[in-house]
Amino acid sequence: MQHDSRNISMLMDFYEMTMAHGYFTKQEKMDRVAFDVFFRRNPDKGGFAIFGGLEQIVEYILNLHFDERDIAYLRDQGIFSDEFLDYLKEFSFTGDVYAFPEGSIIYPNEPVITIVAPLIDAQIVETAVLTMMNHQSLIATKANRIVRAADGRVVADFGARRAHNVDAAVYGARAAYIGGVASTATVLAGQQFGIPVSGTMAHSWVMYYGSEYDAFKAYAEVYPDNAVFLVDTYDVLNSGVPNAIQVAKDVLEPMGKRLKGIRLDSGDLAYLAKKARRMLDDAGLQDCKIMASNSLDEYTIKSLLLQGGPIDIFGVGERLITSKSDPVFGAVYKIASVEKDGKWEPRIKISEAVEKITNPGLKKVYRVYNEKGRAIADLLTLLREVPDTAEPYRYINPEQPWRELYFENCTFKEMKELIIKDGKLIKELPSLEEIRQYVKDQLTNEIWPEEQRFENPHRHYLDMSPSYYQLKLDLLNRIYRKK
């Protein structure tokens, strides 16, 4: 687990602290509660999302503390008691954290993270937990869409300079690697997370030398094993590609080396790639790769390939690192249960908008698989329930509760794992490579191709056990009877 040396314990909305002070003042700080983290819709109208950011969430929670500078700042606000500030001086997180494994394919309205902890502990982590999950889940999901659109071709992250800040660049590169990109141009991310780094030259290199031939020659002499030339500084077809070919013949081939690639960063990429490919092939450079960049995303990549653009590598920047087409993931943090006198009481938030009614109580999430290992649904159950696989299992589709529905010949996998117990890490977290491979394995073996479509993907349902559905119905009826 990578360590962030910064103390970011004050990364919270101010109301987290005002509520914490209120709970402390009312002697309720040690009441145990459960909060669920979930999201309501898939980005870009896709069929699923990818869970990212868990490692950073765990690190934040394990290192949560308030130093003298934090206490002094809070005292200066003039609304917090000395007793509360003394309590914060000794504070550390003492609760439990349950979560899906990082890299899991996730779906709307299921609790991806559940925090069970004393009231103050659970309340003050809300903002940071959401910040980390929202950002990395969004970028991992976007990266995976781009990688799938590239259809086996290499995708590289070029996004740092268009990211919204330094953390967005570095952790965005981490999330993009989880989503499937092959490398990043962000050196700090490579150093911090072990992500392969890639990059060759900018237009400034070509412009400094004055002529493309001299620029390419100089680069080839320094990097004969990794000669990739940027060919669009002046004129791709009349200058850039011809000079790249000439340097390959004059400099690289006498050294026994080959031109590794050219990069197109502007213009009609499909047209230019076709013309450049023909020129390279005619010069005996059939093994030279063509890289394209310039505001690419899954939609432009699919279009380029549909046009027959012979592009081998895509460098993707701003539309990946900002998820430009759908830049908000929208995970929320909602209380689900409160412990009173040793018994857990479920809580539910209701709304005029049906999709914003929460799923109450302590619960399990199971992924349901058919005989071939394909995931056919996710299932919410009461905490005590274990699905019986020996016979057909009845379930409720909450949108059509009158239907008699059964899972037959299916297996059930519980998705949430206990990661932190009583404030201590009890489960070793996977490496970044393991997380990345987990994503690939799920998409290859478990998730239906129909869910991976870009247009009108199949919907993966979140069903309920009859007992859990009845719990939710009883709570709704009780609340509406009180109105």
Indicate where each model-derived feature is located.
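Gly/Ser/Thr/Ala-enriched C-terminal appendages of enzymes
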Residues: M1-D31, D44-G46, A283, L296-K483
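Buried, small/hydrophobic-residue-enriched core segments of structured protein domains
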Residues: M1-R32, R41-P43, I79-F80, L85-T94, ...
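N-terminal, Lys/Arg-enriched amphipathic/low-complexity engagement segments
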Residues: V33-K89
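An N-terminal, globular interaction/scaffold subdomain
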Residues: E59-N63, A99-P101, I106
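Short coil/turn segments at secondary-structure boundaries
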Residues: A72-Y73, T141-R145, G159, E451-P457
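Short hydrophobic alpha-helical runs that function as membrane-insertion/retention elements
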Residues: G199, M291, D312-G315
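Residue-level "edge-of-site" marker
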Residues: H203, S293, G317
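A short helix->loop->beta-strand "cap" motif at the edges of active sites that frequently abuts
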Residues: C288
